[in-house]
Amino acid sequence: MQRLITYLLLFSSSMLHAYELEVNGVYIGILGTRIAYVTSRGEETSEPCYSGDVVVPEQVTYNGRVYNVTSVADNAFAGCDELTSVHLPPTVKAISPCAFIGCTSLRSINVPQSMNVITNAAFTACTSLQQISLPKRQELVDSLTFYCCSSLTSFVLPHRIRTIRCTAMQHLSSLTDLYCFASEPPLAELGSFSLADQKKCTLHVPRETLGMYQERQVWRDFYNIVPLEDEEYEKEGYQRGDVNGDGMIDAKDLELLRLIIVNLPDDSAVRWAADINEDGVINAKDYVLLAKLI
């Protein structure tokens, strides 16, 4: 395990990006005429360039032009062992490979719900990371993404997760609760999790597909599998009535509910939001109640 982490750190140091400007201690690269990205100081120094609490700007101005900061580049924070927290603006849509690898003091980072992509080894060996939330649109947990994040005690897989790659969540030695909101058990490759972690971690899954998780390869190796409770949906921002998951309850949800009554979707999170009166059945009663709420 340590050899792998050392290799990745050495490899990442050879892939540093140059920067064009510095804004409040954050190094910014420029691509084309509209895109800016967070990077490091490049190859001019081997010293970690970030420490403490870092706030990434939403926009920067360069040569008289305004750029949105849209991504965190490969290895941007790699090996910054005194970095403690990072705040990302909603303009950031992607975290590139090895972006935070080896940030051993990183305790927290906000991941905007607008985020589209978190790539492989992004948080490898962030051994102090205590909490991180994936965006609800996330469909893949890539290889080594959270490898050896040994301080995580709980983790949430949103309802659109479809695939978990090998080594994605290995060596999470403090993990006690894993919440998976996907109705269909995601394709979890062999080695996605460490078997030792699975034996002491409780897996929380949608009530109606609990049996599927108990039978599927990899998932069945969790020692304790239990159904998700209502308060756990609410804690993660799911709302009764917000059927389309956009954070608002309006006419769009009412129209979608009308369609759902005719053709019930497989997505348990959508069904949970559509069950307005909480009786376990989605029908005209829910439609009438939602219409009154709007």
Regions found by a protein language model. Give the residues of each.
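Short beta-strand/loop segment at the start of cytosolic alpha/beta domains
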Residues: 18-46
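Structural signature of tandem-repeat unit edges
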Residues: 49-71, 81-94, 103-117, 126-140, ...
